[in-house]
């Protein structure tokens, strides 16, 4: 027997009655705030390109503060930052800046206390300060009051001295701000000997540090800080390749510590490679192959292949299959998306990336939701996705594989003359999925059809996702209407995501229905948005 419900009954506790007595998915100001923190917009559309943030983008945030919920807002900012829910970092930093200069004292204090937790690296701190400057424009009062000076001082003083030395030498400046600016403007009083040394180094330079500490007896911890700062200075002044390699190896210096001329040396790259994080390794494979650092059949290639296929390392680095797929397709092409760099792909590395891609599926945590993916199989899906080197058809195939391998109860269908089941199995390889999809006769991408088909076939789904290029047709029934009809008939509070991967902009999601989302383009941030939306976190 079919489950039927009418809109005068709630589908779950999150629905509320409207003025006509029908139950709807209300988008509360807290929901709008969460969307903003995740992807920089309070509406139902995620754009992959950067948008300039202003107070007009954060009206719900301002209303929540006015309603006396500012401390809850700050807690939400901390949660999104600490749990890695944000697809982009800027919105959380902007929201914190807004909270830090609102008129509500408690919100302000909570925001400043949160600065060390939300601004985890110097780049975040510089961005936060710049947002505060932007928000102060046109206002007569200055921004460097006691509260900001204390928050910035605390940011530095709560750090371990050696870790701070690493941070200030790696991330020197951003957005027009430097550590020297912040230390001067915050009137910092360093909390211990090691931090005093780092502050002197930033403010006065290495010669002053040498002079001040040459005859002082130092604690073992402060001695380490001195030696580390000396290493970062020596590496900038020497042309001796062996000395540079020794300094990299002994003090674990990174690429940012080196001069551009140093990066022309194969041996220096080999030294950097030893401790290079996996994400940086994926980014630099082309460069290192082009410069013969990764020469065919070399020990470096063997080491890279071993690391790429090590499940423990993949898990520790939280590498998503999509990140590996982008690296694989970029590397195979022998050139980047932009720039003049060219290389001949090493077959062993291609094979290792391919293995890593399939291994990484095991590391994705299932959501436990029932998915129905509807795929556009038209020839135009061979176009490049906005923000990626991948074609739309490859992204759609990879997402089908991801859902098939991680979610137990899932269905794949294709837009043909009618909705057709897409025969994708757990053990299929990527090229096999792409071939299966291309074998299906294409039809119009009517975004209402997946819900109408699921309703007709009595298919239970919590999440509908449409993957298309930029064809987002609305024909006899609007997708929002089809989704509401599906919810009503099946008694399931289903959600719809329309992902138009080559589109600059479209509008299908009802902005007042928190169960609908549009995605323009596709990038790694879109994965965070989809997951958060699926788990009801935004």
UniProtKB/Swiss-Prot annotation:
<keyword id="KW-0970">Cilium biogenesis/degradation</keyword>
<feature type="binding site">
    <location>
        <position position="445"/>
    </location>
    <ligand>
        <name>a divalent metal cation</name>
    </ligand>
</feature>
<feature type="binding site">
    <location>
        <position position="380"/>
    </location>
    <ligand>
        <name>a divalent metal cation</name>
    </ligand>
</feature>
<dbReference type="InterPro" id="IPR056800">
    <property type="entry name" value="vWA_Ro60"/>
</dbReference>
<dbReference type="InterPro" id="IPR040322">
    <property type="entry name" value="TROVE2"/>
</dbReference>
<dbReference type="InterPro" id="IPR036465">
    <property type="entry name" value="vWFA_dom_sf"/>
</dbReference>
<dbReference type="Pfam" id="PF05731">
    <property type="entry name" value="TROVE"/>
</dbReference>
<dbReference type="GO" id="GO:0005737">
    <property type="term" value="C:cytoplasm"/>
</dbReference>
<keyword id="KW-0963">Cytoplasm</keyword>
<dbReference type="GO" id="GO:0030030">
    <property type="term" value="P:cell projection organization"/>
</dbReference>
<dbReference type="GO" id="GO:0034336">
    <property type="term" value="F:misfolded RNA binding"/>
</dbReference>
<dbReference type="GO" id="GO:0003723">
    <property type="term" value="F:RNA binding"/>
</dbReference>
<comment type="similarity">
    <text>Belongs to the Ro 60 kDa family.</text>
</comment>
<protein>
    <recommendedName>
        <fullName>RNA-binding protein RO60</fullName>
    </recommendedName>
</protein>
<dbReference type="InterPro" id="IPR008858">
    <property type="entry name" value="TROVE_dom"/>
</dbReference>
<feature type="domain" description="TROVE">
    <location>
        <begin position="16"/>
        <end position="369"/>
    </location>
</feature>
<comment type="function">
    <text>RNA-binding protein that binds to misfolded non-coding RNAs, pre-5S rRNA, and several small cytoplasmic RNA molecules known as Y RNAs. May play roles in cilia formation and/or maintenance.</text>
</comment>
<feature type="binding site">
    <location>
        <position position="378"/>
    </location>
    <ligand>
        <name>a divalent metal cation</name>
    </ligand>
</feature>
<dbReference type="InterPro" id="IPR037214">
    <property type="entry name" value="TROVE_dom_sf"/>
</dbReference>
<dbReference type="Pfam" id="PF25045">
    <property type="entry name" value="vWA_Ro60"/>
</dbReference>
<keyword id="KW-0687">Ribonucleoprotein</keyword>
<dbReference type="GO" id="GO:1990904">
    <property type="term" value="C:ribonucleoprotein complex"/>
</dbReference>
<dbReference type="GO" id="GO:0046872">
    <property type="term" value="F:metal ion binding"/>
</dbReference>
<feature type="region of interest" description="RNA-binding">
    <location>
        <begin position="120"/>
        <end position="284"/>
    </location>
</feature>
<keyword id="KW-0479">Metal-binding</keyword>
<keyword id="KW-0694">RNA-binding</keyword>
<feature type="region of interest" description="VWFA-like domain">
    <location>
        <begin position="361"/>
        <end position="538"/>
    </location>
</feature>
């Amino acid at each position: 027997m079919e489950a039927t419900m009418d809109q005068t009954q709630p589908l779950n506790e999150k629905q509320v009655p409207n003025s006509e007595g029908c139950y709807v998915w209300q988008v509360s100001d807290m929901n709008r705030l969460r969307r903003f923190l995740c992807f920089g917009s309070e509406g139902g559309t995620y754009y992959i390109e950067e948008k300039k943030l202003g107070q007009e983008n954060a009206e719900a945030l301002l209303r929540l503060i006015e309603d006396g919920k500012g401390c809850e807002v700050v807690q939400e900012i901390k949660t999104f930052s600490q749990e890695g829910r944000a697809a982009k970092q800027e919105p959380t930093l902007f929201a914190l800046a807004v909270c830090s200069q609102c008129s509500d004292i408690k919100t302000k204090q909570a925001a400043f206390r949160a600065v060390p937790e939300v601004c985890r690296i110097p780049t975040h701190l510089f961005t936060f300060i710049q947002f505060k400057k932007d928000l102060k424009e046109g206002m007569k009062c200055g921004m460097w009051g006691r509260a900001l000076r204390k928050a910035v001082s605390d940011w530095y003083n709560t750090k371990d001295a050696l870790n701070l030395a690493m941070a200030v030498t790696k991330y020197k400046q951003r957005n027009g701000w430097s550590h020297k600016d912040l230390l001067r403007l915050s009137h910092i009083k360093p909390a211990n000997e090691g931090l005093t040394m780092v502050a002197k180094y930033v403010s006065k330079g290495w010669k002053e540090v040498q002079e001040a500490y040459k005859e002082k007896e130092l604690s073992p911890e402060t001695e380490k800080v001195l030696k580390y700062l000396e290493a970062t200075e020596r590496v900038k002044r020497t042309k001796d390749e062996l000395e540079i390699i020794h300094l990299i190896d002994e003090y674990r210096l990174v690429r940012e510590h080196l001069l551009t001329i140093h990066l022309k040396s194969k041996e220096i790259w080999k030294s950097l490679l030893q401790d290079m994080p996996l994400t940086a390794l994926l980014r630099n494979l082309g460069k290192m192959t082009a410069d013969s650092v990764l020469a065919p059949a070399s020990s470096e290639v063997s080491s890279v292949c071993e690391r790429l296929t090590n499940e423990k390392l993949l898990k520790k680095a939280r590498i998503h299959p999509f990140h590996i797929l982008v690296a694989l397709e970029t590397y195979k092409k022998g050139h980047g998306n932009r720039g003049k760099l060219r290389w001949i792909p090493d077959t062993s590395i291609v094979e290792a990336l391919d293995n890593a891609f399939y291994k990484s599926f095991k590391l994705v945590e299932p959501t436990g939701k029932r998915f129905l993916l509807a795929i556009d199989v038209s020839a135009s899906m061979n176009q490049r996705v906005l923000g990626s080197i991948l074609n739309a058809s490859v992204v759609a195939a990879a997402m089908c594989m991801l859902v098939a391998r991680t979610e137990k109860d899932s269905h794949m269908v294709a837009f043909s003359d009618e909705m057709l089941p897409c025969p994708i199995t757990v053990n299929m390889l990527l090229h096999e999925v792409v071939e299966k999809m291309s074998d299906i006769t294409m039809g119009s991408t009517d975004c209402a059809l997946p819900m109408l088909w699921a309703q007709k076939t009595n298919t239970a789904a919590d999440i509908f996702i449409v993957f298309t290029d930029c064809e987002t047709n609305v024909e006899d029934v609007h997708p929002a209407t089809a989704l509401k009809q599906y919810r009503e008939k099946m008694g399931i509070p289903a959600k719809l995501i329309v992902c138009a991967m080559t589109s600059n902009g479209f509008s299908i999601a009802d902005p007042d229905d928190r169960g609908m989302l549009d995605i323009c383009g596709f990038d790694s941030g879109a994965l965070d948005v989809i997951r958060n939306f699926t788990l009801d976190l935004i």
